[in-house]
Amino acid sequence: MRQKIVAGNWKMNGQIQQVTELVSQIEELIGFDCAAQVAVMPPSIYIPKVRDCLRTGRIVVGAQNVYPKDYGAYTGELSAPMLKDFDCRYVLVGHSERRQFFHEDENFVAQKFHHVKDHGMIPILCVGETLSERENGKTEQIIAQQVLAVSAKGKDCFRDCVVAYEPVWAIGTGKTATPEQAQKIHQFIRDLVGEINDSDAKHLTLIYGGSVNENNAKALFSMPDIDGGLVGGASLNAKQFVEIVKCIN
C-alpha cells in the first residue's frame, strides 16, 4: 500500500511565536484517526523549535532545502546530516521556486535528491511545467526530463522517495489543475517510473502541489494516482490545513 502524505510547506513565513502556535494548533486539531502521514516544513531556522513543540508523534518535521555536501565552505547552507540531527523526515528538492529564483538545474536537483537519500531521509522531488510549456504541448516532455534526471544511479533510485507534481502555473495563483488533469500527469509519472522499476512505481507516493485547499482537496485526493498533497498557503492556517488532511481517505 502506498503511503498517503500531506505536507505543509511554510516557505519563508512566520516568526517564532507564529510557528510554535501554528504547529501546536495543527497537532491539537489533527486527531488520532488520521489516514495520512502529516509533515510540516518550517523555515530552516525554526526546525528545532517546531520539532520540540511536537508532543504526539502524529506530525513529522521536514525541510524546504538542503545543500548536497556533508560539510565545507558553503556559506549559509545546510547539509543533510545537519537536518537529520533535528529529526527531519522529508526534504524538498527541485521546488519550482528554487529552480526559478536560484537557478537550480536538473543536475543540482539530482545531487540534492541522492544526498538526502544517502543520509536516510526521504526526498520529495518536485516537478512541474510552466504555463507557456503547457500551452506549447511540452508538459510531458518537461516532466519526463525532471523525473529522469535523478535516475542515473540505477533502477532503485525511486525507492523510498516521494514525487510531487506542482504545475508552476498553479502555485500561489489560486488556480489549480482539475482532478482529471492532475491525475493524467500523476499516471504519466507512475508509468515513466515503471519503465525503470515496475515494483517501485506501484509503491511510489505521488502528491499534488498546486494551490491545494480545503475546497478542492477531496476531489484531487480521490484520483487513483494522487496520494496526498504538498500544501503551500493553506498550510499557514491550522484549520484549513487540517481540513485538507482529513480529505485523505
Curated annotation (Swiss-Prot):
Pfam families according to UniProt: TIM (PF00121)
Keywords associated with the record: Cytoplasm, Gluconeogenesis, Glycolysis, Isomerase
Region forming the signal peptide: none
GO molecular function: triose-phosphate isomerase activity
Annotated binding of substrate, by residue: N9, W10, K11, G172, S211, G232, G233
SUPFAM superfamilies: Triosephosphate isomerase (TIM) (SSF51351)
Compartment list: Cytoplasm
Listed GO biological process terms: gluconeogenesis; glyceraldehyde-3-phosphate biosynthetic process; glycerol catabolic process; glycolytic process
CDD domains tied to this protein: TIM (cd00311)
Residues at the active site: H95 (electrophile), E166 (proton acceptor)
Reactions accelerated catalytically: D-glyceraldehyde 3-phosphate = dihydroxyacetone phosphate
The keyword Chaperone appears for this protein: no
Involved pathway(s): Carbohydrate biosynthesis; gluconeogenesis; Carbohydrate degradation; glycolysis; D-glyceraldehyde 3-phosphate from glycerone phosphate: step 1/1
Family stated for the protein in its record: Belongs to the triosephosphate isomerase family.
Protein name per its UniProtKB record: Triosephosphate isomerase
Origin species: Legionella pneumophila (strain Corby)
